[in-house]
């Protein structure tokens, strides 16, 4: 019997059809539009997202050799996807990368709310989290709040359209309203945010044992899916990607190479000491995902390519591969986002720098320094993460560069594995569906059977020693630059935050 998995990303919807043995039988993609009606805003039309999903699902269903017996869904997390009592959107979805609630986050940081909330939820607050968006809407669009009956995420919205039932997966709910240890809504968090009134908006919380619902007749008609098949609400995308990469037991690690570099470690305990990064339930019983999503990732490489007159990151990697191992002394600190950096330390004033330039440095040396600087953030996040992983699974568009894969192995000192599946998030949702519907007994068994490794890159130990010295330089340069980050902003430099030692 075949099955379907939906992975609804921010800019692309992906739907994959699977055979029983895990072979990908069909893949359909649909672009989705992010609108920015004002500076810092990021929204999506909820009806358009569902229409794109339904269309892609129907295309896959029509290409399968037999009718699918299950559909699993994962999607982008956070944001606010508000609906009324009839399940109709009360406005556009406010996305995870929306920045309109900066004032709310600044106030919570200043008043100590963010630090206390982290001890309960395990996640650092950001402007695109539901609490910040709700606080902004309550102040600026109270009519919309009054018309809303349920606060959903993208995955919850798609689950509602597929089943008629509003719900949220625990991983999606982990931040900002859930007590990560009790795995339930926290009244104290609502009090801290001053959002007691919003408690009524929270939908049913679905844990690992309650993921399965039945597809509605209307959704079956829209998508071409068979009536009565199970719908599985899988963990949201960063968790599903970890599962799809085979990271399902404590101590395993993965990194998603995208616009952000999300370095993730699986744990069996919750650590809420240094308020940085996020901790969410993985979707695997008894396991948590400790994630460090940086602001310094693929967009920095895009910037570097443009700076050097190149047309793509592929060209940047090719140029960097020709650079000398010592990069002619050039060093790069990659904090280029106007929002600063959020992992493995939090500082909204963080800025990048290119240092050590000389007449001996060529374009290839600068290209290599740029790539190495970005790669150092992966090591920095692993250093801040709990445990000591023995390998690192990589996924995302960056895995197409053989040079970068070898560099990551050498910088981290870990064997790097590349999953055979290009649609890792969808595979993670499918694996969740197999376990949830009893087709596989548990996640380790499911991953062992259905996650294949396409390539493994072993670290060069001599190169790792050299990069360890360079990592120490990276940390020293960062601390030396801190006073410059705030000089032009009239601020006092913050105390050095966690994120790695030598």
Q: Can you annotate each of these PLM segments?
A:
Residues 4-6, 109-121, 132-167, 177-192, ...:
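Active-site core segments that coordinate phosphate-bearing ligands/cofactors
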Residues 82, 103-107, 241-243:
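Pocket-flanking alpha-helical
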Residues 26-30, 203, 455:
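Structural signal for short hydrophobic segments within the conserved structured cores
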């Amino acid at each position: 019997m075949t099955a379907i998995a939906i992975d609804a990303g921010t800019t692309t919807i992906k739907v994959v059809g699977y055979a029983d043995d895990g072979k990908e039988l069909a893949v359909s993609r649909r672009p989705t539009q992010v609108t920015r009606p004002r500076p810092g805003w990021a929204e999506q039309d909820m009806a358009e997202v569902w229409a794109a999903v339904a269309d892609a699902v129907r295309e896959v269903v029509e290409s399968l050799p037999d009718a699918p017996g299950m559909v699993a869904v994962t999607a982008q997390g956070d944001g606010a996807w508000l609906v009324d009592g009839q399940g109709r959107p009360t406005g556009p979805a406010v996305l995870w990368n929306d920045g309109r609630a900066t004032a709310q986050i600044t106030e919570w940081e200043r008043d100590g709310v963010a630090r206390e909330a982290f001890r309960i939820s395990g996640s650092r607050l950001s402007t695109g989290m539901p609490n910040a968006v709700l606080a902004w809407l309550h102040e600026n669009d109270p009519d919309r709040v009054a018309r809303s009956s349920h606060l959903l995420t993208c995955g919850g919205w798609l689950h509602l359209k597929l089943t008629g039932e509003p719900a949220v997966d625990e991983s999606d709910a982990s931040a900002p309203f859930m007590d990560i240890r009790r795995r339930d809504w926290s009244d104290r968090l609502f009090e801290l945010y001053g959002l007691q009134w919003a408690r009524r908006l929270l939908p049913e919380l679905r844990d690992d044992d309650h993921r399965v619902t039945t597809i509605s007749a209307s959704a079956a008609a829209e998508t071409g899916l068979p009536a009565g098949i199970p719908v599985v609400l899988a963990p949201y995308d960063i968790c599903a990607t970890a599962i799809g990469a085979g990271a399902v037991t404590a101590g395993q690690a993965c990194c998603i190479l995208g616009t952000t570099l999300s370095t993730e470690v699986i744990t069996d305990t919750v650590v809420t000491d240094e308020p940085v990064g996020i901790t969410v339930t993985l979707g695997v019983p008894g396991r948590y995902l400790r994630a460090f999503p940086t602001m310094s990732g693929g967009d920095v490489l895009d910037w570097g390519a443009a700076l050097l007159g190149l047309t793509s990151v592929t060209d940047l990697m090719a140029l960097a591969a020709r650079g000398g191992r010592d990069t002619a002394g050039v060093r790069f600190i990659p904090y280029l986002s106007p929002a600063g950096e959020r992992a493995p330390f939090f500082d909204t004033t963080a800025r990048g720098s290119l240092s050590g330039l000389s007449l001996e440095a060529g374009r290839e040396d600068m290209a290599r320094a740029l790539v190495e600087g970005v790669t150092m953030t992966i090591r920095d996040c692993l250093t801040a993460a709990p445990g000591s992983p023995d390998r690192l699974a990589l996924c995302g568009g960056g895995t197409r560069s053989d040079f970068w894969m070898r560099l990551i192995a050498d910088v981290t000192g870990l064997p790097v594995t590349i999953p055979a599946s290009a649609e890792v998030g969808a595979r993670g949702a499918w694996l969740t569906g197999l376990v949830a519907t009893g087709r596989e007994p548990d996640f380790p068994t499911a991953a062992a059977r259905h996650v294949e490794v396409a390539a493994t890159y072993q670290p060069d130990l001599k190169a790792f020693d050299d990069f360890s010295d360079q990592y120490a330089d990276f940390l020293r340069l960062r601390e030396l630059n801190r006073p410059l980050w705030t000089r032009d902003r009239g601020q006092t430099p913050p105390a050095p935050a966690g994120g790695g030692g030598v």
